[in-house]
Each structure stands twice: as C-alpha cells, then as structure tokens.
From Swiss-Prot:
Protein name: Flagellar assembly factor FliW 2
Biological process according to GO: bacterial-type flagellum assembly; regulation of translation
SUPFAM superfamilies, sorted: BH3618-like
PANTHER family: FLAGELLAR ASSEMBLY FACTOR FLIW (PTHR39190:SF1)
Record's keyword terms, sorted: Bacterial flagellum biogenesis, Chaperone, Cytoplasm, Translation regulation
Organism encoding this protein: Helicobacter acinonychis (strain Sheeba)
Length: 135
C-alpha cells in the first residue's frame, strides 16, 4: 500500500511518499517513491510479534494521521540487516505508524527516559531465541 508521510522518517526527510509491502506476518519492506539518489529501501518488523510492545502515540501524530476509533493502525520498527539475519538490530525507539484507512504515515521518536525497556539496536536473535525456548 502507498502512504503519504505526514511526519518524516529520520534521515529521509526529503521523502514524502512510501510503499509498504508485507513480506510475511513478521517482516515488511518500505520503499521511497522518489528517484532521489538517496533512495529509501528498508526492512521493517512487526514489534508485537517479537515482544511486549506498547507506547502512547503523541497527540500531534494522532492529529497528523487523523487517527480515530475507526482507524486501522499498523506499527512497525526498522531493522538494520546484517549478513546473519539473527544478528540484525531492531530500533524500538522510533516506530513507524501507519493509518491504512487514509494512507497516512509518520515516524514517532520515543524517549529512552519514557521507555527504558526499548532500545534502538536490540539484536533480533535475543527475541528469536526466546521464541525457540517457548516452542
């Protein structure tokens, strides 16, 4: 699905349109819709599949995305891929929030002070191992 970014992705402020493609129930791919030399192409993860994950969407983001009780909100976190997938890092402090009802999206920068259990480079393997131990 295509989205218009109402608040930019950090480091990609020049990109306002993105395409979100689901790879599977865990991973998705986000691509910028621009011919800029600084193209956006990143892997995202559904944080709720990895851990307990809850945060308050700031009021200004609610307003920008026109969120209401009927909105279909999707939340993803950026994955910094490594050669070995399990060594990849997840940024839980800067989630991407999408309102699929109207096609708006934004990145939210969370404070470590407010969310001390969230990291910006948590190794994916720490969550994969926990999942294997449950099986």
């Amino acid at each position: 699905m295509n989205y218009f970014l109402k608040a930019p992705i950090l480091g990609f402020e020049h990109i306002s349109g993105v395409r979100l493609e689901k790879i599977d129930s865990l991973f998705s791919r986000l691509m910028g819709q621009t011919n800029s030399p600084m193209a956006l192409d990143m892997v995202l993860v559904n944080p709720y599949c990895l851990r307990e994950y809850s945060f308050v969407i700031p009021k200004y983001i609610e307003l920008l995305l026109e969120l209401d009780s009927h909105s279909k909100v999707e939340v993803y976190c950026v994955v910094v891929l490594q050669k070995n997938l399990e060594d990849s890092m997840v940024n839980f402090l800067a989630p991407l929030v999408f309102n699929s009802k109207n096609g708006f999206g934004a990145q939210v920068a969370l404070s470590m002070m407010d969310y001390p259990d969230f990291g910006f480079r948590d190794p994916l393997k720490s969550f994969v191992i926990k999942e294997r131990e449950r099986a």
